[in-house]
Amino acid sequence: NNNGGDIDAFVKEYEHRNVYFYNDGCIKKILASEKNIMLTTDLVNAALGLIGSDRITNPKLVNPFIPGELGYRGVEPDILLTNDRDGDTPRDRISIEVQHEDKRVFRDRLVLYVARLTSNMARKGENPRLENLNVVGFQFFDAFPESANYRHTVQLRNQEQQVYFDRQTVTLIEVEKFFRKAERFADDSSRLAQWLRAIDTLNREADFSEFANDPVFKVLQNEVKLCRFSSRYLMTVDMSDFDKAMERYEAITEIAKKMRDMGADMSLIVKVTGLSEKTIREL
């Protein structure tokens, strides 16, 4: 608390407000908590596009959040899970990463994550039997600016686009593109799209009624409340990405206001900005 105020009093005053989900410290506490494994499982299946028997069903947290621990930064992913499969099917290993800034070092670090996670699967003196590795990255910049898609799978392929090794996959989700091109994705009813919209609604503290009947999102709505986070833990959390989210929200509201004042159709403004009609009218 740089201003010398009482952070406990701050948490008490704003206990029913929402934290910024994509903050490193906040997402770790929410998704890496044993009690929220249902949330994490649903999000992973949505991000990887897994359905039916391919779904992750009973994952285990490798580095669970422990109540009372402080947030920290390291060279490994904050959220890491494993999921056993029947028979001889290799075990799944899944990590979740969030990146707000488009820096060259991010790609280097992401490749380093993949290399380290893969290396850790091999035991000394044994023939390597690699697990099915999935690294999921939620990005707030375009990894593939020319692509019409916001979800991308990256694997080892040859020049004819044939997959050489299918147990090492990086899934990149361009969050910012999804909302910047909201009109393009307006009819996307995939589970991943639902997740992105639900998270965005909570980050903006907008009307959540659209998601209130979904049991998973109901839990999510409860877990992002500030009162779920201790003042001691919040003091260790870097909030710079929260500031960036606020800048993005302010930019979106400005676009909505200009479109409204120019006489644009309300349904179009809603699609483009993701804001509710009520919010747009009150700007």
Where are each of the predicted segments found?
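Intrinsically disordered, low-complexity linker/assembly segments
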Residues: 168, 174-176, 191
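Accessory alpha/beta interaction modules
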Residues: 1-170, 179
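Short hydrophobic alpha-helical module
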Residues: 44, 50, 142, 176, ...
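Ferredoxin-type iron-sulfur electron-transfer modules in oxidoreductases and energy-metabolism complexes
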Residues: 185
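Active-site environment of non-heme Fe oxygenases that use a 2-His-1-carboxylate facial triad
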Residues: 157, 174-175, 220-221
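Short amphipathic C-terminal alpha-helix that caps PH/PH-like domains
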Residues: 44, 113-114, 192-199
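Short, charged alpha-helical interaction segments and adjacent helix-coil junctions
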Residues: 1-17, 25, 82-90, 94-99, ...
